[in-house]
Amino acid sequence: MDCVFCGIIAGEIPCAKVFESESVLAFKDIAPQAPVHIVFIPKNHDITSMDGITGANSAVVAEIFAAIAQVAREQGLDAGYRVVCNCGEHGGQTVGHLHFHLLGGRKLGVGMV
């Protein structure tokens, strides 16, 4: 297993699930950067990064963003939250499987880097 997220999807690696649908999985990050830090991934490994999104495969991205909004409401993030997607080595991406981070639960700094 080369992809840790595929291992989580397959049930080979445990996770604290927060949301699951037919094509999206969300779970608590194992090294949280905020009180609420949830990772959202497509269950299919077809898209490895933001630059792999096309019109043909963008439906799963729309589903991920709908799931992020739903989970943010469920987590009580009414005061605000941040969604992050690292793209490529220089963007800080460490897992070659498209994923988005939902961060919240406290006031986040205004800096992006």
Region roles according to the model:
Residues 1-113:
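HIT superfamily nucleotide-processing domains
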